[in-house]
From Swiss-Prot:
Functional summary from the UniProt entry: G-protein coupled opioid receptor that functions as a receptor for endogenous alpha-neoendorphins and dynorphins, but has low affinity for beta-endorphins. Also functions as a receptor for various synthetic opioids and for the psychoactive diterpene salvinorin A. Ligand binding causes a conformation change that triggers signaling via guanine nucleotide-binding proteins (G proteins) and modulates the activity of down-stream effectors, such as adenylate cyclase. Signaling leads to the inhibition of adenylate cyclase activity.
Cellular location(s): Cell membrane
Record organism: Cavia porcellus (Guinea pig)
Carbohydrate-modified residues: N25, N39
PANTHER family: KAPPA-TYPE OPIOID RECEPTOR (PTHR24229:SF1), NEUROPEPTIDES RECEPTOR (PTHR24229)
Lipidation, S-palmitoyl cysteine type: C345
A Pfam family assignment: 7tm_1
Protein family (similarity comment): Belongs to the G-protein coupled receptor 1 family.
Protein name according to UniProt: Kappa-type opioid receptor
Any one GO biological process: regulation of saliva secretion
Amino acid sequence: MGRRRQGPAQPASELPARNACLLPNGSAWLPGWAEPDGNGSAGPQDEQLEPAHISPAIPVIITAVYSVVFVVGLVGNSLVMFVIIRYTKMKTATNIYIFNLALADALVTTTMPFQSTVYLMNSWPFGDVLCKIVISIDYYNMFTSIFTLTMMSVDRYIAVCHPVKALDFRTPLKAKIINICIWLLSSSVGISAIILGGTKVREDVDIIECSLQFPDDDYSWWDLFMKICVFVFAFVIPVLIIIVCYTLMILRLKSVRLLSGSREKDRNLRRITRLVLVVVAVFIICWTPIHIFILVEALGSTSHSTAALSSYYFCIALGYTNSSLNPILYAFLDENFKRCFRDFCFPIKMRMERQSTSRVRNTVQDPAYMRNVDGVNKPV
């Protein structure tokens, strides 16, 4: 998705050096590079980024961020999926959606080493097949994540505002079916990314780029079309649905003191609703900047200053950072996840604590006995 600038191609002597920060694509968010036409110009649709404006420190900083995202995101999301599979009590409708979100996040974190390498090497060294896979995973994550969060919000809305209907709708089986539908729907974009994604050798600057390969004649049209589709279907419409759901939920929670007839169930309902709200809010905070940046760039209103270009790449990094935040949110905000995480990470300690608690409970429940002179046990 490129931000390109019209103008004549640079002479070979003025082309950026091999160690200039070109940042060729390896992500659905990074721009491709314009291919000069036969007359040596960039063509009417080609606005090319100024590589010289990008500080060489940016790849190093972003690589460090991606390394943390890779470790925390892959381990954390894998642990979330394991906990939901391992413990029967965790197989609730909400947690089935959380599993889907963790799967999408875990997949996208596996692309971090490839993208970090691209930042450091200024070229895509992994070949055409991996290029297609990485870009496809990016688009799958983009759509499955926001679709899953939207369904989680709808699920919460039904649980809070329509508790009777929730008995039929909010089941683990139906949540699994909805997750499958989300992946099938996202495949319309993910498979397109596999088909269109590919590598292109840029001999003029000695790099290999990995990006969506649109027809050269209609590049600007297809580029703009893809950006608008992503902005509308992977951001605007889902966020509007989420806002409507939570607005109705807040009104309902304010108007009713007790939702379920039981204080304990009511506390759990509000706790889970709060967890989903925080996860959704963090997602929107992390992804809004890059979506806005892409939209403004598509309309040709972006600046080419160092600050603007630096902000652009850090907005991309912020979006990927979200994939490592969700497991941390679950650990802090949900007691069931926290308990299961502790049980997995410290099994011996948790087993000893349970045994100690069990002994204390038995001591309290069982009365002490004392043998009298007749040899009969009597409670003390």
